[in-house]
C-alpha cells in the first residue's frame, strides 16, 4: 500500500488542459507547466549501449535472457591461471633443470 502511494507521486497528474486556460493571472504559468509536461519524452527509455569492456561482459552474460553460469567458469579458470602463475613464479622457476630433486 505504501509502495503504491510512493510510486504514484512520481507520475505527475494531468495539470490542466490547454483549452481550459482562461484570462486568469496565473494562466501563463499554467501554460508553461502544460508545455513542459507535453515536451517530456513518452514511452520506455531507449536502451543504453554498453561501451566499456566490463559493461559489454555484463550485457552478454548477466542481463535479460542471456543470464548463464559461464561467469562462474571464467572466474574458476582465472583463479586456476592466477594460482599456477604464482606457483611458477615462487617455486617452479627455481627447479627448471631438476638437479635439486
UniProtKB/Swiss-Prot annotation:
Keyword Ubl conjugation annotated: no
Database matches in Pfam families: F1F0-ATPsyn_F
TM region(s), chain numbering: none
One of the protein's GO biological processes: proton transmembrane transport
Keywords, alphabetical: ATP synthesis, CF(0), Hydrogen ion transport, Ion transport, Membrane, Mitochondrion, Mitochondrion inner membrane, Transit peptide, Transport
Note: Present with 14600 molecules/cell in log phase SD medium.
Protein's recorded name: ATP synthase subunit f, mitochondrial
Organism expressing this protein natively: Saccharomyces cerevisiae (strain ATCC 204508 / S288c)
Amino acid at each position: 500500500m505504501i509502495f503504491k502511494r510512493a510510486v504514484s507521486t512520481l507520475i505527475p497528474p494531468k495539470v490542466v488542459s490547454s483549452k481550459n486556460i482562461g484570462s486568469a493571472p496565473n494562466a501563463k504559468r499554467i501554460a508553461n507547466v502544460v508545455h513542459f509536461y507535453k515536451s517530456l519524452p513518452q514511452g520506455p527509455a531507449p536502451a543504453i549501449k554498453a561501451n566499456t569492456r566490463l559493461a559489454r561482459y555484463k550485457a552478454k552474460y548477466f542481463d535479460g535472457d542471456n543470464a548463464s553460469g559461464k561467469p562462474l567458469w571464467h572466474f574458476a579458470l582465472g583463479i586456476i591461471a592466477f594460482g599456477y602463475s604464482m606457483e611458477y613464479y615462487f617455486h617452479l622457476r627455481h627447479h627448471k633443470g631438476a638437479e635439486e630433486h
